[in-house]
Curated annotation (Swiss-Prot):
It is found in: Cytoplasm. InterPro entries: Mur-like_cat_sf, Mur_ligase_C, Mur_ligase_C_dom_sf, Mur_ligase_cen, MurD. Its EC number is 6.3.2.9. This is UDP-N-acetylmuramoylalanine--D-glutamate ligase. Its main location: cytoplasm. Cell wall formation. Catalyzes the addition of glutamate to the nucleotide precursor UDP-N-acetylmuramoyl-L-alanine (UMA). Pfam families: Mur_ligase_C, Mur_ligase_M, MurD-like_N. ATP binds at G119, S120, N121, G122, K123, T124, T125. GO terms for molecular function: ATP binding; UDP-N-acetylmuramoylalanine-D-glutamate ligase activity.
Length: 450
């Protein structure tokens, strides 16, 4: 860990606990800050807050009182999930108090360089692929962020010869000041999180913060097939490395003659890759680009791509029952992810979809329903998905209250050779704590059918 003195004896407000807030508060105390921790959940229900209080921190729970800002606060470290429209953040901004997220702290203390990966979809798969390729190539990666350990915990122990690989959301990237990844990858942009950002433009600009501090000594890995990403790459001063599944890229990554190439050199045949789905070729090209930029051999990349079958809750194969294959794609929290999941199969599909209503309709899914023989909807968006399915002319359309019911109905509508696919196209928070919980409940319900 770098020797950092900028936080010593400063009053720093950690807003929102959870894993990242807990780690940030603990780190800041270690760095000599006077830490004030604030969380909306009452202290009596807040185990993490009680632990921080026992460490000697000033803990205020049950709301976000504006009076906290009267304590000569030098910095606010916010939980990514707390919107900037929250009154305490609005007031902090008016007082010109810097507001950052935990990943910014991680960067400031880390001896190791960062690889940052963002995009609307594919972040986790690309992050895991990158980690595995670098590990196989003996480049000493450590993984941090939404998968793995919280970034500022990893950064404390990361050495100069290692590399921190982290998945970054728009929420996290809105709170960066000095964060400068050696390699920044921007995979794609799709209209999402409008309840948080307001517009797709603002959402895209938040994502583009990944390029904010890059220089000509850094690299920006860009999806050449995504017009929005290409436009936002103008914010990068780094060396641009493009990847594409549709056109030949001489100085980047592409698919040519059914093989993956990087800077004109063949790396692997597409037929040797075990990870399913056309969309995953984009993720693979991005990960391969990062790995090659860090000196990983073609042999190491090939070894990984011949064994990597995917990440849990991302088009995860569950089991086969009476020749029906069940797949868990609970991480599909927006339409683009579900479109890509539906495009991954040629067999008839029984689709389970639904979840949190963020105000959008689902007509964009209609062209992807060509292999969908039946849909079972659940959650807040069930009526909207039913409308889209009716417009698509699906014969079998059902709505149920719970995911358990949806699994039973989906199985009843399936036949020999079908795929039963959970790909909700929505966030999970209307009925579940996380998409992981939703996926686990789906898997449990499937196994009950056996």
């Amino acid at each position: 860990m770098k020797t950092v003195t900028e936080f010593q004896n400063k009053n720093i407000l950690v807003l929102g606990i959870a894993k990242s807030g807990y780690a940030a508060a603990t780190l800041l105390q270690k760095l000599g800050a006077n830490v004030i921790v604030n969380d909306g959940k009452p202290l009596a229900e807040n185990v993490l807050a009680a632990e921080l209080q026992a460490k000697g921190m000033d803990v205020v729970c049950g709301g976000h009182p504006l009076e906290l800002l009267e304590r000569n606060i030098s910095l606010v470290v916010k939980n990514p999930g707390i919107p900037y429209s929250n009154p305490i953040l609005v007031a902090a901004k008016e007082k010109q108090i810097p507001i950052v997220t935990e990943v910014e702290l991680a960067y400031r203390i880390s001896e190791a360089p960062f690889v940052g990966i963002t995009g609307s979809n594919g972040k986790t798969t690309t992050t895991m692929l990158t980690f595995e390729m670098l590990k196989e190539g003996q480049k000493h990666p450590v993984i941090a962020g939404n998968i793995g350990t919280v970034a500022c915990e990893v950064a404390q122990d990361a050495k100069e010869n290692e590399v921190v690989v982290t998945e970054l959301s728009s929420f996290q990237l809105m709170g960066v000041e000095l964060f400068q990844p050696k390699i920044a990858a921007f995979l794609n942009l799709f209209e999402a999180h409008l309840d948080y950002h307001g517009t797709k433009k603002e959402y895209g600009l938040a994502k583009a913060n990944i390029f904010k501090n890059q220089t000509e000594n850094d690299y920006s890995v860009i999806n050449a097939d995504d017009a929005d990403v290409m436009a936002l790459s103008a914010y990068s001063k780094g060396q641009k490395i493009l990847f594409s599944t549709t056109k030949e890229i001489e100085d980047g990554a592409c698919i040519k003659d059914n093989a993956l190439y990087f800077k004109g050199e063949k790396v692997i045949e597409v037929s040797d890759i075990v990870l399913p789905g056309q969309h995953n070729l984009e993720n693979i090209l991005a990960a391969m680009s990062i790995a090659k930029l860090l000196g990983t051999s073609n042999e190491a990349i090939t070894v990984v791509l011949k064994r990597f079958t995917g990440v849990k809750h991302r088009l995860e194969y569950v089991t086969t029952i009476n020749n029906r294959k069940f797949y868990n794609d609970s991480k599909a929290t927006n339409m683009l992810a579900t479109e890509k999941a539906l495009s991954a199969f040629t067999q008839p599909i029984v689709l389970l979809a639904g979840g949190l209503d963020r105000g959008n309709e689902f007509d964009d899914l209609i062209p992807y329903f060509k292999n969908v023989k039946a849909i079972v909807t659940f959650g807040q968006t069930a009526p909207k998905l039913v409308r889209a399915a009716e417009k698509a002319g699906l014969d079998i359309i059902e709505s149920v209250d719970t995911l358990d019911e949806a699994v039973v109905k989906a199985y009843a509508h399936s036949k020999d050779g079908d795929v039963v696919l959970l790909s909700p196209a929505c966030a999970s928070w209307d009925q579940f704590k996380t998409f992981e919980e939703r996926g686990d409940i789906f898997i449990q319900a499937v196994h009950k059918l056996i």
